[in-house]
Amino acid sequence: MTNGPGLSRASRFLLYGAAFVILVTGVRMAEPILVPFLLAVMLAVICVTPLRWMQRKRLPTWLSVLLIVLVLLGIGTMAGTLIGTSLIDFTRSLPGYQIRLEREMTELAAWLSGHGFEVSGQLLADSFDPGEILLVVGRIFTGVGDVLGKIVLILIITVFILLEISGFSAKIGAAFPNADRHLASVTEINDNVRRYLALKTLLSLATGVLVAVWLRIIGVDYALLWGLLAFLLNYIPSIGSLIAAIPAVMLAFLQLGPSDGILTALGYLVINTVIGNFIEPKVMGEGMGLSTLVVFLSLIFWGWVLGPVGMLLSVPLTMIMKIVLEASDETRWIAVLLGSRPTEVVVGGLEDEPAEWVGM
């Protein structure tokens, strides 16, 4: 049985698979170019709302774009300065943390010996190296540092996108005969991604501020750095908040002792539980349209393809891919598999007859 002119269903499946492999290989090879471009596109999507607002206030487009760029440049400069100075100070403080660690481990070994467990304090100290904290933080911020190093390129691309965005609809209408369908897809992509990024940014900002305030109250060093880390990694679904908590909790144990370390961990747990499990689902609703499994797999996939930035952008990139797949009868079945509710009607795809996907 065939499903297309001259191609069997299996042949079409193999053809799609080969095209996917070639496309992914090309994207991985083009990662140094694609990452700044994708970040610029996402920045432009976020900045469209303030741009439209300033235009309604009768500000010229060039002045509106200039103000937006100055704000972005200021934020990037402050973030880069905070990261750089904090990591330098952190490195200088490591010997002091090492001394505290050895003292704590000696006391722990004595307590264990009193309860019948003979353990060397030096062995415990060697098994918990504070340098690992710096290593974890350094790896996390490596991708951020690379992005900040390309901030000029990202801002230039963002400027051109914002300047061109007003005439984009007219270009689509002139370029495609079936312009309404393409414009509908572009509008859906823009609305969904902009809503997701705007809400996620606000929730991440709230997470970062609460973490920084809580750590400052407890007395953990570099509270602003850990707040910034919580803000950035909150964009990463599922595991971002957990990764953000690890270095701060380790430092709290090392700097202030077990009780304050537990308080730090509890603070992270409460903040992320309230925001991630209660506030975010109510605010986001069904807006993402992606299943939980797909969100987690997209995190792994885009992280492998585009590195740390791919993990940050995994959800919006998968949302875009799903909307694009929905626009074609040939690929709509893939979009259904990516979705959170398998109740859509699939037309075309691998089957000759339309099939209604019914949840179990």
Q: What is the predicted function of each stretch?
A:
Residues 32-39, 217-229, 256-264, 290-295, ...:
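Membrane-water interface of transmembrane alpha-helices in multipass transporters/channels
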Residues 17-22, 26, 66-79, 148-155, ...:
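Generic alpha-helical transmembrane segments of integral inner-membrane proteins
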Residues 261-360:
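Hydrophobic alpha-helical transmembrane segments of membrane transport and translocation systems
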Residues 12, 145-254, 258-266:
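Alpha-helical transmembrane segments and their immediate interhelical loop/hinge regions
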Residues 2, 6, 50-57, 63, ...:
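Juxtamembrane membrane-interface segments in integral membrane proteins
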Residues 29, 33-37, 49, 53, ...:
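Membrane-spanning helices that line or support transport/gating and their immediate boundary helices
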Residues 52-56, 89-92, 96-103, 107-110, ...:
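Short amphipathic alpha-helical coupling elements at transmembrane boundaries
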Residues 1-85, 323-360:
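Anchoring transmembrane alpha helix of integral membrane proteins
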